[in-house]
Swiss-Prot record:
Class of this enzyme: ligase
Record-linked Gene3D superfamilies: 1.10.10.410, GatB domain, N-terminal subdomain (1.10.150.380)
The protein's name in its UniProt record: Aspartyl/glutamyl-tRNA(Asn/Gln) amidotransferase subunit B
General function of this protein: Allows the formation of correctly charged Asn-tRNA(Asn) or Gln-tRNA(Gln) through the transamidation of misacylated Asp-tRNA(Asn) or Glu-tRNA(Gln) in organisms which lack either or both of asparaginyl-tRNA or glutaminyl-tRNA synthetases. The reaction takes place in the presence of glutamine and ATP through an activated phospho-Asp-tRNA(Asn) or phospho-Glu-tRNA(Gln).
Signal peptide positions on this chain: none
Gene: gatB
Catalytic activity annotation: L-glutamyl-tRNA(Gln) + L-glutamine + ATP + H2O = L-glutaminyl-tRNA(Gln) + L-glutamate + ADP + phosphate + H(+); L-aspartyl-tRNA(Asn) + L-glutamine + ATP + H2O = L-asparaginyl-tRNA(Asn) + L-glutamate + ADP + phosphate + 2 H(+)
Organism name: Cereibacter sphaeroides (strain KD131 / KCTC 12085) (Rhodobacter sphaeroides)
Pfam families, A to Z: GatB_N (PF02934), GatB_Yqey (PF02637)
């Protein structure tokens, strides 16, 4: 396991006009369950389908249609809970959250208020190498997503697309343990990474498959410690919720603006109103959406169409037995097995596909060299062209072949980069391409000695300088490699130059 030092949350202190203030942040992450069917119907969850084409009679609340729980969605929620080291509740139940909105055909949302499927868990957020913060998870519950209202197609009409209606969501609720914008973004990034490793949510924020509601409040220094002692939320100040954030950068910007807005109100002698707000990235500010409702405003009651959900411990154990290696464990293994640095291990394990690619390249080879090539050459080229690891034209086997040619001494590092470029644009087998292009390193010491002798004979003044300052011998090495068209083995050239110059 990773050798981590746990650090108490460090609040971001914001200087107001009159006082210092501290930030307190809690988050509700809405993660769309990776499932081919919706939570209570068999309708497809395919993104980007024609409007209102993925809608069943259950989704659009036709009379007499009853919901039927999707067992796979339940398993995905359990898997998520296990991945977050959370308590799995063998008994849970669904409730109706009553409110009217055009994209909610039933007039209520099926959720889990009183008996969620997953209880308390945790997420470790590494803020610096070896330094981790613990963010506690309060609960995870299953619920339906709503549809999508569209207001910009006609100046006089609004439209509703019910394709998303009834899609399964996991709402992952944190404790108010987050103390700054950067930590909030890091928490979302770590949670997204875990969900993607688990295969329970694809984490695509652009498509709305992972959305964050951010609860922000400010308090005077020392008040948070009183909350920790008493668990009395009144010490934390009045919170405002910023809805539907789908960007790490916007999350940070919204928190920073909202904190300063609340501080200005309090220092002017006003009171912060508990409300739901939206973030406008164009203006860089939050704006009021509606007053913040409490649970009683929604008139929650148990859904009479759904029996309580009772699962067996044996089924939970089966899911636990099939759990994949998670990011922290994979990072620790990469550092131990392949000798990569903490930074490189973070980069290599950021995405599951990238970690698999690296491991295929590194297996049986120099791990540090493999990491250097994957991060600097491959990832650098992918980022430059805006591609993902799935789009790479150089497969892991091909890059491994390049490293094998370097290890055998057949090609130099410079040749390897030229070969990588050819594989990127044209493809092919590395060994065959190198042979066809004459990319073979000169290792014949006789040929190298001849080249060294010629360079030394032609540059007597440079010879005297090199003897006086051995660091200048590198000039001869460069000239020899240049004279051989870049094919001379650098190690052999260095050795022969040193011998010839008597260094």
């Amino acid at each position: 396991m990773l050798d981590l030092t746990y650090e108490a949350p460090k609040p971001k202190v914001i200087a107001g006009a009159k006082h210092d203030w501290e930030l307190v942040i809690g988050m509700e992450i809405h993660a769309q369950v990776s499932s081919n069917a919706k939570l209570f119907s068999g309708a497809s969850t395919t993104f980007g389908a024609e409007p209102n084409s993925n809608v069943s009679f259950v989704d659009c609340a036709m009379p007499g249609m009853l919901p039927v729980i999707n067992e796979f969605c339940v398993a995905q929620a359990v898997r998520t809970g296990l991945g977050l080291k959370a308590q799995i509740n063998l008994f849970s139940a669904f409730d109706r959250k009553n409110y009217f909105y055009p994209d909610l055909p039933q007039g209520y949302q099926i959720s889990q208020l009183y008996h969620p499927i997953v209880g308390e868990g945790e997420v470790l957020v590494e803020m610096a190498p070896g330094i981790a913060r613990l963010v506690r998870i309060e609960r995870i519950h299953l619920e339906q997503d709503a549809g999508k209202s569209i207001h910009d197609m006609d100046p006089n009409l609004s439209f509703v697309d019910f394709n998303r209606t009834g899609v399964a969501l996991m709402e992952i609720v944190s404790r108010p343990d987050i103390r700054g914008p950067e930590e909030a973004a890091a928490y979302v990034a770590k949670l997204r990474q875990i969900l993607r490793y688990l295969g329970t949510c694809d984490g695509n924020m652009q498509n709305g498959n992972l959305r964050a509601d951010v609860n922000v409040s400010v308090c005077r220094p020392g008040q948070y410690e009183k909350y920790q002692e008493t668990q009395d939320f009144s010490h934390l100040g009045t919170r405002c919720e910023i809805k539907n954030m789908n960007s790490m950068r916007f999350i940070q910007q919204a928190i920073d603006y909202e904190a300063r807005r609340q501080i200005a109100i309090l220092e002017d002698g006003g009171k912060v109103v508990q409300e739901t707000r939206l973030y406008d990235p164009d203006k860089g500010e939050t704006r009021s959406m509606r007053s913040k409702e409490e649970a009683h405003d929604y008139r929650y009651f148990p859904d009479p169409d759904l029996l309580p959900l009772e699962i067996e411990q044996g089924w939970v154990d089966e899911i636990a037995a099939s759990m994949p290696e998670l990011p922290d464990a994979k990072k620790a293994r990469f550092m131990a097995d392949y000798g990569v640095t903490d930074y490189d291990a973070n980069v290599l394990t950021a995405e599951l596909e990238a970690a698999a690619y690296f491991e295929e390249v590194a297996r049986g080879r120099d791990g540090k060299q493999a990491a250097n090539w994957v991060i600097n050459e491959l990832f650098g080229r992918l980022n430059k062209q805006g591609l993902t690891i799935a789009d790479t034209p150089v497969k892991a086997g091909q890059l491994g072949g390049v490293l094998d040619l370097i290890a055998s001494g057949e090609i130099s590092g410079k040749m390897a980069k030229d070969l990588f470029e050819i594989l990127w644009t044209e493809g092919g087998d590395p060994a065959e391409v190198a042979a066809a292009r004459g990319m073979k390193q000169v290792t014949d010491t006789g040929a190298i000695e001849t080249a060294v002798d010629e360079i030394i004979a032609a540059n007597p003044a440079q010879v005297e300088k090199a003897k006086a300052n051995p660091k200048l011998a590198g000039w001869f090495v460069g000239q020899v490699i240049k004279a051989t068209g870049g094919k001379a083995n650098p190690a052999a050239v260095n050795q022969i130059v040193a011998e010839k110059l008597g260094l």
